[in-house]
C-alpha cells in the first residue's frame, strides 16, 4: 500500500506544473491569431573596436498586439500575463548574446530565464459560474482583477513594446558565421512557468538571420557639436512659443578609422531614440509641459524616432561624413503650457551594416 501511495504522490507532482503552465493562451492580435511571429534581422556587422558587453545591433521599436485569455485556474484566482524573455536559454551562441529591451530595461540570456509582468490581469473563467452577489457573499472580491465582481475581464488585448538586440560575449574571428539562425527571444505566458508544449497557444517572438552577421576590421568615431551635447533653447515667454516654433541646429561628424588594419567597406544606420511619449506617427516627442520636439533633416523633413535609417556609406573612399540637424520646439494646440525649466533626453544610436 505504501508503494501505491508513493506512486500516486509522484504522479500528482508531475501533473501540477503542467496545470500551471497551461493557465493562459496568448495570440498575435486577436483570439485564435498566430502564435509564432518572427523578426528577420537584416545583415549587419560587428565593428572592429567592439568589446565584450557592447550592444552591436538593435532593432527598431517593435510593437506587438497581444491578445490573451483562457485563465483556467481552478482556485478562481486571477492571473497576470508575463513576457518570458529568453524562455529557452539552453540555445546560445559562443560570441553573441541575444536579448530584449522591454519598457526600457535590458534582459538577456546572462540573466537566465526572466519573466516580466505586463500588468495585464485576466480573471479565471471558472468564476463566471457565480453571480456578483455570490462573489461578494463569499468575500472573493480579492480574486478578481478589478476587485469589482461586476467588472470581470476574461481576456485582455494590449500592445507590448520592445526592442531586440545583440551583444558581444567575446570578439568573434573576422570570418565567423553564427550557426544560431532562429532564436525565440520572448514568449507570452502565465505566471507559473513557460509552457514548452509545442502545441501550446502561447505567442512566441523569434529573431532570424543571425547567420548573416559579419565581423569588420574597421569602426567609426563620432563628435557632436555643440560639444556639451546639450541643445539649449534659452529663455522664452509663452506668447512667443504659441505664435511660432523655436529652432536650434546641431551637427554630428563621423570619421572612419584610418589605419592599415581597416580594409572593410560598410554602411552605418542611425536612430534617434527616446523613452518619451511619441505622436504624429512617432515624428514628434511630447516633453510633458505642453510642448513637443521634432528633429528635422537638411530638407526640413522630420525624423521618425526609434527607427533606424541609412546614415552614412563608407563602402567608397569616404573617410569623414558630417550632417546637420535642426531641433524644433513648438506648442501643442489646445494644451496648456507649464512655465519653468524643462529637459528631455534623446540618444543617437547606430548599427553597422
From Swiss-Prot:
Record carries keyword Signal: yes
Gene Ontology CC: one annotated term: pilus
InterPro entries tied to this protein: Adhesion_dom_fimbrial_sf (IPR036937), Adhesion_dom_sf (IPR008966)
Signal recorded as keyword: yes
Secretion signal span: 1-23
Lineage top rank: taxon: Bacteria
GO biological process: cell adhesion
Keywords annotated in UniProt: Signal
Function: May be involved in a fimbrial system chaperoned by YbgP and exported by YbgQ.
Family: To E.coli YqiI.
Protein name in the entry: Uncharacterized protein YbgO
Organism: Escherichia coli (strain K12)
Species lineage: Bacteria, Pseudomonadati, Pseudomonadota, Gammaproteobacteria, Enterobacterales
Amino acid at each position: 500500500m505504501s508503494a501505491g501511495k508513493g506512486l500516486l504522490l509522484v504522479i500528482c507532482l508531475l501533473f501540477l506544473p503542467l496545470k500551471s503552465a497551461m493557465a493562459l493562451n496568448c495570440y498575435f492580435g486577436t483570439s485564435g491569431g498566430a502564435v509564432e511571429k518572427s523578426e528577420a534581422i537584416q545583415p549587419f556587422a560587428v565593428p572592429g573596436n567592439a568589446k565584450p558587453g557592447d550592444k552591436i545591433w538593435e532593432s527598431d521599436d517593435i510593437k506587438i498586439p497581444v491578445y490573451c485569455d483562457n485563465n483556467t485556474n481552478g482556485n478562481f484566482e486571477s492571473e497576470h500575463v508575463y513576457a518570458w524573455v529568453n524562455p529557452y536559454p539552453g540555445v546560445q551562441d559562443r560570441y553573441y548574446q541575444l536579448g530584449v529591451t522591454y519598457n526600457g530595461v535590458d534582459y538577456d540570456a546572462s540573466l537566465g530565464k526572466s519573466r516580466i509582468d505586463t500588468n495585464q490581469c485576466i480573471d479565471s473563467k471558472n468564476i463566471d459560474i457565480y453571480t456578483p452577489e455570490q462573489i461578494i457573499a463569499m468575500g472573493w472580491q480579492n480574486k478578481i482583477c478589478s476587485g469589482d465582481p461586476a467588472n470581470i475581464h476574461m481576456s485582455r488585448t494590449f500592445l507590448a513594446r520592445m526592442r531586440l538586440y545583440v551583444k558581444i560575449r567575446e570578439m568573434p574571428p573576422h570570418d565567423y558565421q553564427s550557426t544560431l539562425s532562429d532564436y525565440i527571444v520572448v514568449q507570452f505566458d502565465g505566471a507559473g512557468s513557460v509552457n514548452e508544449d509545442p502545441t501550446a497557444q502561447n505567442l512566441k517572438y523569434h529573431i532570424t538571420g543571425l547567420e548573416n552577421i559579419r565581423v569588420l576590421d574597421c569602426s567609426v568615431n563620432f563628435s557632436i557639436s555643440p560639444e556639451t551635447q546639450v541643445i539649449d533653447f534659452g529663455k522664452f515667454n509663452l506668447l512667443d512659443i504659441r505664435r511660432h516654433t523655436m529652432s536650434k541646429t546641431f551637427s554630428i561628424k563621423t570619421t572612419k578609422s584610418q589605419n592599415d588594419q581597416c580594409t572593410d567597406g560598410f554602411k552605418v544606420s542611425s536612430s534617434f531614440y527616446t523613452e518619451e511619449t511619441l505622436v504624429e506617427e512617432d515624428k514628434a516627442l511630447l516633453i510633458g509641459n505642453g510642448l513637443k520636439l521634432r528633429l528635422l533633416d537638411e530638407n526640413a523633413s522630420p525624423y521618425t524616432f526609434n527607427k533606424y535609417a541609412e546614415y552614412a556609406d563608407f563602402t567608397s573612399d569616404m573617410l569623414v561624413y558630417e550632417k546637420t540637424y535642426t531641433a524644433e520646439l513648438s506648442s501643442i494646440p489646445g494644451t496648456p503650457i507649464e512655465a519653468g525649466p524643462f529637459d528631455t533626453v534623446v540618444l543617437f544610436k547606430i548599427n553597422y551594416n
